[in-house]
């Protein structure tokens, strides 16, 4: 169920923001697909390319939530700074509104502590992005190199049975096969043969058992890369999910701090929030704060 939920989240992300982000990420990995293939590559859950995008897209999504939390944090700070600059907080302890001012000071201290904890999360996000990009870049370089080697081997194999099949046709067919057959999460023999069948179906050729075995052997290096990708996905998925929960928690906590501060300020007999300045301070807050919740 967790895998389905995570995939639904990415599907919603892709449907909302289209293919541009995905194309840019694949471009960083020196992977370029024709427009008609990229839509399939990023929208079909079984696709190798969809798996490759999983962590980078999650990092982008987490980054948006973290930025929203940061915007709330900054706004809460501005509310308190304007209040402190007004001189309201320095009134005599026995003057009207003393209890409210004490509560506002408690909120200020909590906000400082929360901000320190949030900064640690921002650093954790930066480290996660750097480490995951380095690992996925290495896998992508290996994939691109081994893909070309494999295509040359397959080209030689198919030439022996059908000289009309061109290397470019094999490339397109193999990419389509890796889009439709999930060899990242399931490297069973059944799945491997399904991939070979998809490859030959796209090429519109019929091959015997011996040639199938030869094709399978020549694909072994690509299978190893997919296995390495799966290992890294397991590692980074745990980290991105943990970070996601923390980011959403901070966003909620900062939002709740804002509500409490505003309600406390309303109780003060003399100090009021400046509507004009508040409108300026609120400008960065017009976003969908349910992002990452669905």
UniProtKB/Swiss-Prot annotation:
S-S pairs: none
Principal cellular location given in the protein's record: cytoplasm
Recorded hits in CDD domains, A to Z, give: DotZ
What keywords is this UniProt entry annotated with? Cytoplasm, Protein transport, Transport, Virulence
Which InterPro entries does UniProt cross-reference here?
DotZ-like
Q: Which GO terms describe its cellular component?
A: cytoplasm
Q: What effect does gene inactivation have here?
A: Deletion of the gene leads to a reduced intracellular growth in the protozoa A.castellanii and decreased levels of effector translocation. Deletion of dotZ results in the absence of both DotY and DotZ proteins in the coupling complex. Deletion mutant shows significantly reduced DotL polar localization.
Q: Does the keyword Transport apply?
A: yes
Task: Indicate where this protein resides in the cell.
Answer: Cytoplasm
Presence of keyword S-adenosyl-L-methionine: no
Biological process terms from the Gene Ontology for this record are: protein transport
Describe its partners and assembly state.
The T4BSS is a complex nanomachine composed of several subcomplexes. This subunit is part of the Type IV Coupling Complex (T4CC), a subcomplex composed of the DotLMNYZ core and the IcmSW-LvgA adapter subunits, linked by the C-terminal tail of DotL. Six DotLMNYZ hetero-pentameric units may assemble into a hexameric nanomachine, forming an inner membrane channel for effectors to pass through. Makes significant contact with DotN and DotY, but engages weakly with DotM and DotL. DotY and DotZ are co-dependent for the assembly into the T4CC.
Please explain the role this protein plays, according to its UniProt record.
Component of the Dot/Icm type IVB secretion system (T4BSS), which is used to inject bacterial effector proteins into eukaryotic host cells. Part of a subcomplex which recruits effector proteins and delivers them to the core transmembrane subcomplex. DotY and DotZ play a role in effector translocation, but are not essential and do not influence the stability of the subcomplex main components. The DotY/DotZ main function is to optimize secretion by modulating the delivery trajectory of the IcmSW module and the localization of the machinery to the poles.
Protein name, per record: Type 4 apparatus protein DotZ
